Structures are given as C-alpha cells and as structure tokens.
C-alpha cells in the first residue's frame, strides 16, 4: 500500500489512515476505494491521484 496525492489540490490519501469523513476505514488500499470516492478537499475522482 502506498500514499497517493491529488494532482489538483495536493491532498494525500494515506491507506494507514483512510478517509474517516468519507467512510473509508484505515487499512483500505487506494486500489480498493469505491469508484464513487472523490478527493475530500477538491472533489475530483480518484483518477486524478498519483502514487507518491
């Protein structure tokens, strides 16, 4: 599992933390995020994220 960063706003998704506000529990790999998940800061879909 790796960290992914939003190309638009720079928000980082860390799978060890998850996205509690978005209903994503800690330990969820980026690849396992639901298709409808979007950046909690700017709202773009997960195709706008790059692995860092």
Curated annotation (Swiss-Prot):
Q: What cofactor does this chain's UniProt record say it requires? A: Fe(3+)
Single GO biological process annotation from the record: alkane catabolic process
* Pfam families in the record: Rubredoxin
- One GO MF term attached to the UniProt entry: iron ion binding
| Cofactor comment text | Binds 1 Fe(3+) ion per subunit.
The Rubredoxin-like domain covers 1-52
Ranges that cross the membrane? none
**Highest taxon, organism lineage:** Bacteria
Q: Which residues bind Fe cation?
A: 6, 9, 39, 42
Q: Which UniProt keywords apply?
A: Electron transport, Iron, Metal-binding, Transport
Write out the similarity annotation: Belongs to the rubredoxin family.
Function of the molecule: Rubredoxin is a small nonheme, iron protein lacking acid-labile sulfide. Its single Fe, chelated to 4 Cys, functions as an electron acceptor and may also stabilize the conformation of the molecule.
Put simply, this protein is called Rubredoxin
